[in-house]
Amino acid sequence: MTAPSQVLKIRRPDDWHLHLRDGDMLKTVVPYTSEIYGRAIVMPNLAPPVTTVEAAVAYRQRILDAVPAGHDFTPLMTCYLTDSLDPNELERGFNEGVFTAAKLYPANATTNSSHGVTSVDAIMPVLERMEKIGMPLLVHGEVTHADIDIFDREARFIESVMEPLRQRLTALKVVFEHITTKDAADYVRDGNERLAATITPQHLMFNRNHMLVGGVRPHLYCLPILKRNIHQQALRELVASGFNRVFLGTDSAPHARHRKESSCGCAGCFNAPTALGSYATVFEEMNALQYFEAFCSVNGPQFYGLPVNDTFIELVREEQQVAESIALTDDTLVPFLAGETVRWSVKQ
């Protein structure tokens, strides 16, 4: 038996699902991503959401202005789908290289999604246009009906929304984002080449027991919510199999500490500083490090039809302690795995 490798050299990764927020928060969090990743799909759920080419161009510039000198980072912008969105605006943004993809949030599914889509039928002209021009649809795959249990919302979405949509628009490219269930893992694996998925580090590392047993851990609270162990294991097995239509999407979602540690706390894990090492740990635990680079750096570009990055980064296998918090202007930000000792980290 050989000793585990102490250095992992991989092609520079991309993050295919990222929240950067805006204003002072954006300026704080951007460097944690731009330091490591070549590109990131940036979520459009600002207040107000990014629904026009003009808004996306302006937001992209604010992101670029926050990238430190020496970082080579390209934000890939997305359009927030609404019931009233003009298909021509979406197509113009795609053709001009402003929009890389469009995001479907069911109304009120997650942070700043009150403008989201009330039904797929309401945006069918937009989706038909996307199918025609080859624009990927990114989906937060949960139903939001009040009578459906929060732990069942992803599985119900597959049968009631996702499958009918893909049957109707057979050429539409779809990314099932941040999948959290065995149902979704099986669905994506059994799908065709036009269906892919992203998985977060927290859904690979933890299940709902970690969040709820022995005290509520608000910094593990995200949406879709952590599920039971059987679902966590299915996700781990999917990435460890080398399946090539699943790729890195951190869903890093920063909230100030007082908005997380609250009587009605916000959903989201700020994992940008620790995500890549977390993924490496999971792949190592699953004896699947041979598939780690593809998950981080190859599968995503392949699905999107983009070139892979031509630079490389290294991760080192040495214990490091994660910072307890990161300073904001008037609060602090608690990173994923705050205060814990991690096994893998990006070589500085």
From Swiss-Prot:
A GO MF term: dihydroorotase activity
Residues bound to Zn(2+) 1: 17, 19, 103, 251
BP GO annotations: 'de novo' pyrimidine nucleobase biosynthetic process; 'de novo' UMP biosynthetic process
Record EC number: 3.5.2.3
Cofactor(s) named in the record: Zn(2+)
Active site residues of this protein: 251
One Gene Ontology cellular component annotation held by this UniProt entry: cytosol
Pathway in which this enzyme or protein is active: Pyrimidine metabolism; UMP biosynthesis via de novo pathway; (S)-dihydroorotate from bicarbonate: step 3/3
Reaction catalysis annotation: (S)-dihydroorotate + H2O = N-carbamoyl-L-aspartate + H(+)
Modified residues (N6-carboxylysine): 103
Annotated substrate binding sites: 19-21, 45, 140, 223, 255, 267
Enzyme kind, highest EC tier: hydrolase
Task performed by this protein: Catalyzes the reversible cyclization of carbamoyl aspartate to dihydroorotate.
Protein name per the record: Dihydroorotase
Gene (UniProt): pyrC
